[in-house]
């Protein structure tokens, strides 16, 4: 007997899309937009979600330094491998750019929060930036919804899914794992 199963392409988990190296070549940093060919391929695939800022490289991602004009953004430490002399990675493909792309292709962001450098307040600020309505400022302090609006997106991004860190025990096969830096730091401070 033949069985036929219909699969809704929106129910297929999407892609793990990294911020580094201009989205690994899918983002045009000169024009600050996704490359047209990638957009078409993505739409054809019908992915329903985008995991950002990536997997293990998200462990040291500082979302706040990816906001605003690219000339003012600070380089990131790659969260997986950090080869000597690398000098950091320009976060051209930042949180605003991935959110704009997600809107364009009708996909949902699955945000991987940086357990390696974040804290509860930073995570709350991120949720406010992504999801708060302008004028609400639920965390007090910096009005992150207004920062989002000032960066060109007045409506909330409505991100529903968050992961906390990624493979925190993973070692780097092609460089020095960021976890090795944390271990050395903690040992030097007498922390076990």
Give the positions of each predicted feature:
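Non-catalytic accessory regions flanking glycosidase/transglycosidase catalytic cores in CAZymes
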Residues: 1-192
